[in-house]
Amino acid sequence: SIRIKDALRERRMELWLQPILPLRAEGRTYFEALVRLRDADGKIVMPGQFLSAAENFGNMQQIDQFALYEAMNLLGTHPQLALSINLSARTLNHAQ
């Protein structure tokens, strides 16, 4: 949709990290990388409100590329992080 394309172009997509807590106290902390969108007023739009539209309008590859790019930048500055990123099936099936 136009709203999603605008958010990508205007850099209103963000990558948030949610800790994945280990069952044992020792060990490495892992994080799930989650995409969030800010609307034109700066309010957070949760994925349930925009991911279906992104799938329907063919924007998931752009969102996934954003998430991967941001995650790689983050890992470049914080190599000790361990990240999990959810990607769409369409992105994984698309050969480039």
Where in the sequence are the language-model features?
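Bacterial c-di-GMP phosphodiesterase EAL domain
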Residues: S1-Q96
